[in-house]
Regions:
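A short alpha->beta transition loop at the rim of the catalytic pocket in nucleotide-sugar-dependent
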Residues: 206, 233
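Nucleotide-sugar-dependent
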Residues: 148-151, 194-198, 210-228, 238-247
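N-terminal pre-catalytic "stem/leader" segment of glycosyltransferase-like enzymes
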Residues: 1-53, 237, 304-307
Length: 307
């Protein structure tokens, strides 16, 4: 049995870590999580860095281990390009790399070397694919995810109220956003919830709301919440940006794109045109974490071809 030591930032929300742990344990191996590299034992056999910065001294200390570098996203502004180049130049060379997408791989600039790699998109827990609503929806829309991001969309939130639409926020609302929401009686929030309670909260609404600033790298990266809405059978309303447009094409009729300047009347019409919630989602099995992880070649690198 091999223990895989994951090193990640304590402040990051990384649902993939739970999926990795479950998959690795199903393969008969073990997992330990670390927020500081120095807590990884010297005799570790496998170290999986969620990048972030990989300290060269720690990588040398652990040179007896198979080392994986995972890039879940490219760097964000300010100085995003420079941050990515610093990672490219300063990171030690690993045994394997994992990228969320081909776009992230190219953005990080590693395409010229010989290190083997895999692309691993975001997934959803299998429980999302089977959860069912137990009562009619109480809200028109539900939003899950990074709440601070909603500060970019306060005018849109006001438009939802003008359209007579009720919005549920699933998660912890920061104080600066609360100040904006105080005058908006059409919005309620749940506060922070354990992830296993999220499906029931999302199913309280008719549709999922996906809002993302149309700036790199956010506009090219997977919106996990949009995948979770789809996995629960909810139709989705999203602002248009590159990744959302591709996803709307891949899930024809399930994702409606609506511009940020859309009027209250446009929102009312969009909501009336939404399809019904899907109760049978077997065709969406590929969104599940088990499907995303099972074929990754990184397992052979860590555990050998026999696993």
């Amino acid at each position: 049995m091999i223990t895989v030591h994951f090193v990640h930032g304590a402040r990051s929300y990384l649902p993939e870590l739970a999926a990795y742990q479950a998959h690795i344990e199903r393969l008969g191996h073990a997992v330990q999580m670390h927020t500081q590299a120095h807590t990884v034992p010297d005799d570790a056999q496998a170290v999986w860095w969620i990048c972030g910065r990989v300290p060269a001294a720690q990588a040398r200390r652990l040179q007896g281990a198979v080392q994986v570098h995972e890039y879940t996203s490219a760097s964000v502004a300010p100085l995003a390009w420079l941050k990515d180049r610093i990672k490219q130049w300063q990171h030690p060379v690993p045994d394997f790399r994992v990228f969320q997408s081909e776009w992230v791989r190219q953005r990080m600039g590693f395409e010229g070397d010989a290190v083997p790699y895999a692309l691993r998109d975001m997934g959803v827990p299998e429980s999302f694919l089977t959860a069912q609503a137990l009562q009619p929806p109480e809200f028109d829309l539900v939003y899950l995810g990074e709440m601070r991001r909603l500060l970019h969309f306060v005018p849109l939130l006001q438009t939802l109220g003008q359209a007579g639409l009720k919005l549920l926020l699933v998660g912890d609302v920061p104080p600066d956003l609360k100040a904006h929401l105080a005058a908006l009686g059409h919005i309620q929030s749940t506060g922070r919830l354990p992830h296993d309670q999220v499906p029931a909260q999302l199913l309280r609404a008719r549709a999922g709301l996906n809002l993302m600033p149309d700036v790199l790298p956010l506009s090219e990266q997977t919106s996990t919440k949009l995948l979770e809405y789809l996995a629960l059978g909810l139709p989705v309303v999203s602002n248009p940006y590159a990744w959302a447009k591709r996803t709307a094409q891949a899930h024809a009729g399930r994702v409606q794109l609506l511009g940020l300047q859309a009027s209250a009347a446009h929102w009312q019409a969009a909501m009336q045109a939404l399809p019904l919630r899907q109760t049978d989602r077997q065709h969406l099995a590929s969104l599940g974490w088990s499907h995303q992880l099972q074929a990754l070649p990184v397992w052979d690198a860590l555990f050998g071809a026999g696993r």
